[in-house]
């Protein structure tokens, strides 16, 4: 009998660390299902979830403060292995009888940890480990039934363990790539201490999702808004595998897409994969609605409202459609849940996080709501979607509507599309595209004097933007070679009639945002 991929599970309690979602992604990489919940979860919820192990994340608070977060007592009464990371180790130590003190100097950055004792956590690892530290407090006395298993020159208890209960604590962050063997430590905890197997694979996720879609919708028809982006594309492939022609995709070409994107979506999903697609050519409708509007937030709202209106109209034509499929992913669920309840553990509740009207009277099909973006891409590859589509740089929902600064006009969009296509084409040709995190072109609604042949011309300006980032929360501008930038600039000015000047944006985030609007 095939094992259910959700049967083995790890619970991660979030104490507010910027790395907490990264912990969850690492556990999934190991091949084990996990969920991320707020630290103040009710005991009954943990009992119902019935985890094979619990991880206490890092966090910005100080255990030495009176009202700082604590793990629920049931964590230590449940009988399952527990792994405390940074703040998680500190609250574990303090709650189980140890002592934590505020350090005179904050430890931040690389550190060499000396493994001082035998421990299942460090099985098959060297006695010296390069790790990433980020803490102010530190454990100064471990609980009576714990042993020290690692130290640094400035941190006497860099790791501790109660091997009998399978409780482990580390003062560093094993989830970040800076900790060289961090993934191995997490594997030792999840696979060895907790006894989990690697059931969570791309193939098994697809099999599970297809079965769940079939069970959920039965013989009913399903409608999906297909944008050509990663999430909706993967949902389309999963739903089509599950229910075939009972899926109808609605693709709205709003005139704000990249060069030839509409044709590419129809060719790939209609001609190549054989999906039922209704294409709505709505360029005029969107541009008419945007006429005269220059304020970015207002433009976003207009584009969103027009899309919803069109989708609503098309869905009403499909009398038998009882279900709406959406590309909601796990970070959307976490963010939406936290904003509504202050807690992140409502993965089971089916609330609409996609902005479509609540009166559509359809059930929601959200096969990606348990998945992180990197997992979505991996199952997309398994489903046969092309690498270059799945790993394409992020593109904003409003499309060129927020990359044309100020008022959006067809002329501006056409110029921007062609300039951006040249930039992206040259990035691929120079093998630079996948070395930057995001690259695009922005249309500036200002004219600049240029020289063409013997004459002068007075045409528009575009800006090239390329950034390097890990999490898109902060970003550095990409130091692209001057020769490369020169080539792109020359091509745009020579090939796109109407553009006389190309500039390169060298702003970091912060203070600037990645997108201009």
From Swiss-Prot:
It catalyses: XMP + L-glutamine + ATP + H2O = GMP + L-glutamate + AMP + diphosphate + 2 H(+). Coiled coil: none annotated. Pathway: Purine metabolism; GMP biosynthesis; GMP from XMP (L-Gln route): step 1/1. GO terms for cellular component: cytosol. Pfam families: GATase, GMP_synt_C, NAD_synthase. GO terms for molecular function: ATP binding; GMP synthase activity. Keywords: ATP-binding, Glutamine amidotransferase, GMP biosynthesis, Ligase, Nucleotide-binding, Purine biosynthesis. Its EC number is 6.3.5.2. The active site is at residues 86, 173, 175. The keyword Nucleotide-binding applies. CDD domains: GATase1_GMP_Synthase, GMP_synthase_C. ATP binds at residues 227-233. Residues 9-199 form the Glutamine amidotransferase type-1 domain. The keyword Ligase applies. Residues 200-392 form the GMPS ATP-PPase domain. Catalyzes the synthesis of GMP from XMP. Homodimer. NCBIfam families: guaA_Cterm, guaA_Nterm, PRK00074.1. HAMAP family: GMP_synthase (MF_00344). This is GMP synthase [glutamine-hydrolyzing].
């Amino acid at each position: 009998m095939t094992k259910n991929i959700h049967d083995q599970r790890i619970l991660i309690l979030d104490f507010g660390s910027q790395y907490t979602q990264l912990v969850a992604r690492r556990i999934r990489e190991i091949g084990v299902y996990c969920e991320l919940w707020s630290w103040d979860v009710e005991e009954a919820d943990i009992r119902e979830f019935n985890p094979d192990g619990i991880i206490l994340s890092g966090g910005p608070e100080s255990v030495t403060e009176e009202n700082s977060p604590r793990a629920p007592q049931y964590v230590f009464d449940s009988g399952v292995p527990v792994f405390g990371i940074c703040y998680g180790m500190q609250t574990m130590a303090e709650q189980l009888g140890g002592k934590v003190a505020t350090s005179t100097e904050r430890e931040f950055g690389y550190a060499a940890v000396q493994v001082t004792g035998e421990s299942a956590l460090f099985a098959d690892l060297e006695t010296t480990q390069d790790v990433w530290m980020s803490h102010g407090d530190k454990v100064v006395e471990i609980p009576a039934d714990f042993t020290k298993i690692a130290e640094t020159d400035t941190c006497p208890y860099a790791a501790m363990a109660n091997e009998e209960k399978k409780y482990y604590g580390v003062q560093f962050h094993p989830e970040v790539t800076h900790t060289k063997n961090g993934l191995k430590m997490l594997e030792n905890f999840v696979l060895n201490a907790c006894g989990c197997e690697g059931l969570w694979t791309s193939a098994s996720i697809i099999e599970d999702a297809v079965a769940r879609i079939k069970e959920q919708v039965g013989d009913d028809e399903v409608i999906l808004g297909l944008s050509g982006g990663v999430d909706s594309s993967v949902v389309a492939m999963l739903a089509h595998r599950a229910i075939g022609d009972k899926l109808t995709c609605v693709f709205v070409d709003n005139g704000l897409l990249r060069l030839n994107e509409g044709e590419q979506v129809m060719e790939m999903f209609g001609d190549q994969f054989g999906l039922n697609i209704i294409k709505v050519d709505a360029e005029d409708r969107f541009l008419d609605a945007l006429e005269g509007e220059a304020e970015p937030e207002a433009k976003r709202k207009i584009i969103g409202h027009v899309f919803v209106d069109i989708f609503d109209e098309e869905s009403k034509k499909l009398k038998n459609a009882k279900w709406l499929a959406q590309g909601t992913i796990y970070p959307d669920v976490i963010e939406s849940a936290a904003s509504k309840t202050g807690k992140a553990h409502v993965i089971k509740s089916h609330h609409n996080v996609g902005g479509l009207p609540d009166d559509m009277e359809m059930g929601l099909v959200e096969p990606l709501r348990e998945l992180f973006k990197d997992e979505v891409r991996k199952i997309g590859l398994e489903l046969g979607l092309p690498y270059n589509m799945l790993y394409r740089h992020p593109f904003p929902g409003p499309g060129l509507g927020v990359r044309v600064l100020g008022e959006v006009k067809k002329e501006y969009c056409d110029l921007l599309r062609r300039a951006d296509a040249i930039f992206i084409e040259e990035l691929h040709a120079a093998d630079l595209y996948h070395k930057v995190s995001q690259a695009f072109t922005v249309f500036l609604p200002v004219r600049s004097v240029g020289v063409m042949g013997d004459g002068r011309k007075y045409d528009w300006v575009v800006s090239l933007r390329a950034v390097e980032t890990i999490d898109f929360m902060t970003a550095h501008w990409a130091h692209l070679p001057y020769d490369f930038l020169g080539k792109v600039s020359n091509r745009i000015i020579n090939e796109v009639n109407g553009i006389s000047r190309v500039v390169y944006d060298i702003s970091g985030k912060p203070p600037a945002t990645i997108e201009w609007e």
